[in-house]
């Protein structure tokens, strides 16, 4: 049986750099700190209410107390009401996810308090922000309670802006607009493809195409270790330690940006060139339990690759299908017989005479599973 997930209204995110003044940057940092404290208080209140009184609080219970919060703690009057509401929604979402994991029998992971520096964004869900040009023709982002901030709109925003999120990444500030957009259909190619993701090669396609694994984290590992060792030698609380921590964070940011750029480009190629894209429905959480492969799997970011391909396919009118990964590498794509092979064996050789790369063999099997009636486990598309 197949489960079909329909996306009626695609959402698209636009991210831009903003350039606050020193005073504005301090206000943004203070806003993040106030949001962090509120988030932690919301978690603590829920914890106490349940332990002492057996009461499960929800978002609405806590949102009703925001007015009293502002009266008691005057600095919260400096924050837009919807920003505060969004903080409580995040806390509520954390508990919803916790209960969902408990229901599924997964490792629950009770919602955690956010330490300093670990709450890096706040959101205006519906109002409190606007875009405009000043008298000199420069672009500005007006934020309620903060003022006009310089922004660089390097590309045109399409669709209707639904939310505005301000995010701090190390020493830089960004804004991310979540927009409701009309699907932009791409021309049909009448082609389907199976995709087998891996570590040796990032991906093998059923048409024989191989995508190299860039291994961005591995390439930066030596430099990262060097800077982390320097960080460990710095005195806690010192300015030199803060500066060194920023250096380490910048390396991580560069790796993250390189990886995301690669994933966007490769997923875009798939959606442009194929109408139907079939992936394995991999359980990444279980796979990273193998400590020898965990870092390489995380560096490859297979889940994010599938996620990017899926939302691009939704907007383009294409289809993404997920199939059971069981034995896709062991079954011969030519005759259907099982040919056992170890991970070290990179070539598929079958008594039927078929000889080809094991990953391409798997990709062909993945395509067959995805396009056979009733064999797919999940489908995403329009």
Predicted segments, located by residue:
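Positively charged, low-complexity nucleic-acid-binding target-recognition regions
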Residues: 2-9, 295-296, 300-382
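Gly/serine-rich nucleotide phosphate-binding loop at the start of the catalytic core
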Residues: 2-84
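Short acidic-glycine loop/turn motifs at beta-strand connectors
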Residues: 21, 135, 169-170, 206-209, ...
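Stable alpha-helical structural segments in soluble proteins, enriched in small hydrophobic residues
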Residues: 42, 87-98, 360-370
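Substrate-contacting helices/loops that form the catalytic groove of nucleic-acid
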Residues: 49-73, 158-163, 169-306, 373-382
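Acidic carboxylate diad motif detector
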Residues: 61-167
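Glycine/proline-rich, flexible active-site/cofactor-binding loop segments
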Residues: 119-181, 187, 303-307, 311-315, ...
């Amino acid at each position: 049986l197949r489960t079909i997930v329909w996306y009626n209204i695609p959402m698209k995110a636009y991210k831009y750099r903003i350039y606050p003044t020193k005073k504005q940057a301090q206000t943004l940092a203070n806003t993040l700190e106030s949001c962090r404290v509120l988030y932690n208080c919301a978690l603590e209140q829920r914890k106490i209410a349940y332990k002492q009184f057996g009461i499960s609080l929800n978002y609405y219970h806590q949102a009703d107390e925001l007015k009293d919060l502002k009266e008691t703690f005057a600095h919260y009057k400096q924050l837009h009401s919807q920003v505060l509401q969004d903080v409580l929604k995040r806390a509520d979402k954390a508990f919803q996810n916790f209960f969902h994991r408990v229901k599924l029998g997964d490792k629950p992971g009770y919602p955690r308090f956010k330490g300093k520096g670990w709450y890096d964004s706040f959101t205006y869900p519906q109002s409190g922000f606007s875009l405009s040009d000043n008298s000199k023709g420069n672009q500005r982002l007006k934020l309620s309670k903060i003022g006009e901030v310089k922004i660089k709109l390097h590309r045109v925003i399409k669709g209707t802006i639904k939310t505005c999120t301000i995010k701090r990444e190390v020493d830089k500030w960004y804004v991310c607009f979540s927009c409701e957009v009309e699907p932009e259909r791409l021309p049909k190619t009448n082609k389907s493809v199976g995709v087998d993701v891996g570590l040796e090669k990032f991906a093998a396609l059923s048409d024989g195409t191989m995508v190299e694994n860039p291994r961005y984290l591995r390439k930066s590992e030596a430099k990262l270790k060097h800077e982390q060792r320097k960080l460990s030698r710095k005195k806690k609380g010192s300015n030199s330690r803060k500066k060194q921590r920023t250096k380490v964070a910048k390396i991580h940011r560069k790796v993250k940006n390189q990886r995301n750029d690669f994933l966007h480009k490769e997923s875009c190629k798939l959606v442009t060139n194929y109408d139907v894209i079939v992936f394995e429905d991999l359980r990444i959480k279980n796979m990273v339990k193998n400590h020898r492969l965990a870092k390489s799997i995380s560096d490859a970011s297979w889940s994010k690759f599938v996620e990017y391909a899926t939302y691009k396919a939704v907007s383009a009118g294409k289809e993404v299908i997920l199939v059971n990964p069981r034995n896709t590498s062991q079954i011969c794509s030519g005759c259907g017989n099982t040919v056992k092979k170890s991970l070290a064996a990179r070539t598929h050789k079958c008594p039927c005479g078929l000889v080809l790369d094991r990953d391409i063999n798997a990709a062909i099997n993945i395509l067959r599973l995805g396009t056979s009636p009733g064999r797919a486990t999940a489908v995403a598309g329009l």
